[in-house]
């Protein structure tokens, strides 16, 4: 009896240890931050960049290293204490025509792919990768930082962005980084993050690189998951508008953007420029013109031949006096743990640290520039009382068509006869073959699901073992 009890106790210990390992692994999969391995990074480049080694490893957005066309750099990590999983690159300017090559320890190329148009590039390294070559082509490149990380959750600003969709439900057009939070800050939290509509933000001007980083941090805070657009016009106020911010040039850029990315609804600035900012005025007037011209095949034949025309259904402007509706900015949003859209917009504005020391503030409905008040300045459908009212739901990027089910065939009835007929035999009909089940990929969700199944089983086994011990102890006591 004592031997049996010892075995059961040993089984309990094993089960408890297994349970703790599974729980620990589950927490590690979801909560473990990636380890910074940048100190192990070796950088090989031309002699003219001797000082670049230290500069590229620092988090200083005001400093960058410029590489000429076809001037490659090679990165490796021979002395790293663990396998790197991510190579992260922060560009000072958007990379154009840059190739990225992964090579194994023998120098054999494993992959070659172009770098996307993002300011922060995250490269997933294959297990066999021993080095990476960054190769600018025709236009060169400017890099401000390179970092190396292990498996895990990457720190800001290396967010898991999705590609900018070519087909959107909405597009917020902001003149500067921070304007999207100050004057249109309820759109992304309410319609994007909370209601699931597909869209992003377009920033018309590109001031300093720091402002770009603040824009990305603020956009992510508001719930944007699709990478924003940067049109890279110069930030000029007020001197220089006549040379660098002409309305016809801005309108042309907007038409090309609308035709390429095809938003159903566009939201932008007050026609009066909120507090009178001349660039805000040009942006709001130009986006209304662009919504109309994007559907005209005679305007800008180049973008028409490349993308075709596009019909924007609605264009809303901040504070526009006609066809107005007011957003509920004080409703708790489940996507943000109960925070309101107003709170989210204000938190997002705080990500623009270079701008928070001034007079700007996200105004509620009682303020001078209430963020919740919009009016439809252009539309091909009636305004209604909400952003997406009167738009055909099948046009939305997030629309999922219902599954078509075949209509049942009408039952055949026999004509009555004077002579009795035999009861027809029941012929079994074959059930339709089920659709093949796709093989699940080993994502983090499927891993978590497997653990969720194993944990109850282990709990049940532990409970059964405890019950067995109690029963045996009770029998021993009864016999004695």
Give the ranges of each region predicted by the language model.
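Active-site beta-strand->loop->alpha-helix modules in alpha/beta enzyme cores, enriched
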Residues: 32-86, 90-300
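Bacterial N-terminal signal peptides that target proteins for export
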Residues: 1-9
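Juxtamembrane low-complexity tails/linkers enriched in Ser/Thr-Pro and polybasic
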Residues: 436-449
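Sec-dependent signal peptide cleavage junction
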Residues: 19-29, 448-452, 473-476
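C-terminal membrane-anchoring or membrane-association module
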Residues: 459-480
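Bacterial N-terminal signal peptides
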Residues: 11-20
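The feature marks non-catalytic terminal segments
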Residues: 29-68, 91-93, 104, 119-121, ...
